[in-house]
């Protein structure tokens, strides 16, 4: 047991009774992100947590590389938020990941995760860390003689173009 929760993509899709996102174009599971930020940053006020969730959920870089770099920095170092202390605005960092105790994080694996971008695609598996997609796994049928690693690699490269928003935090 590695501590990952498993869900089928349909179960968390828009319109499902257990939906975790409002639209197929959304790739960040905001409820999980918010819960993790609250758990990991109990010293920050509600408004700071709300600001951190908004910054991540609404971030739009000028390129996939820029977006990925900024999200990586936020995951590694924390999301900058402004809080008021003694009448003064101060910048703090809302930590996204518990780096010393992995079990304190929310790990989720979703199979058949539908995402709508330039096209609609459905990666075989997506791994989420505290609501952020951090890994995309493409599986191939070992009984299919034409299936190989290069086909899986090319499929993931196509995903970068077609559903690039899935790669911003990963």
Question: In which residue ranges do the predicted regions lie?
Answer:
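An alpha-helical interface "stripe"
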Residues: 1-170
